[in-house]
């Protein structure tokens, strides 16, 4: 298990672009003629908030990612929100054994999850997305956390937006 420093976190800056995905085998000519409306992030934000609790698994269920919490920021009633903040928890059921050592006595204690009971090591990632963008592209920052790669984060964001779309068809 990778060590997380309790007093510091690495934060990376990204650009998030919202676009459409074709889920059919349309020709490039047909795809080029599509003018599907793409909602702005400020319109999607309240719908993303409703996805709180969404769970998705990776690596044959060994990694389980949960959208643990979602908040619009700032929280002040007289201000319009400018950002959406996501708390994403990832549980790795294949994490290695953690060893805690007392440097005074040299006593070592091994701590290992009960994998057969669904336990694993949990880490959290924070994602902050601006609600104001340019050409469907929004500033985003996220904490760098072991087990939550940029690819996995993109996959989860796609999943969240897919669930938003499913819940608002029609």
Roles of regions detected by a PLM:
Residues 1-104, 146-170:
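Terminal interaction module
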Residues 109-169:
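Intrinsically disordered, low-complexity linker/loop segments enriched in Gly/Pro
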């Amino acid at each position: 298990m990778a060590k997380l420093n309790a007093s510091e976190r690495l934060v990376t800056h990204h650009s998030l672009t919202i676009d459409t995905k074709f889920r059919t085998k349309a020709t490039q000519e047909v795809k080029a003629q599509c003018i599907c409306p793409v909602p702005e992030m400020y319109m999607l934000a309240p719908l993303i908030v409703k996805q709180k609790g969404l769970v998705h698994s990776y690596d044959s269920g060994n990694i389980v990612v949960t959208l643990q919490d979602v908040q619009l920021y700032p929280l002040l009633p007289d201000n319009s929100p400018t950002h959406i903040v996501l708390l994403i928890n990832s549980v790795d059921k294949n994490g290695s054994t953690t060893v805690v050592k007392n440097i005074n006595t040299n006593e070592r204690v091994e701590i290992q999850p009960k994998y057969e009971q669904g336990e694993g090591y949990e880490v959290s990632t924070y994602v902050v997305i601006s609600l104001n963008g340019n050409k469907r592209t929004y500033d985003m920052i996220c904490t760098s956390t072991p087990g939550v790669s940029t690819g996995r984060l993109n996959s989860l964001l796609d999943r969240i937006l897919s669930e938003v779309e499913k819940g608002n068809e029609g």
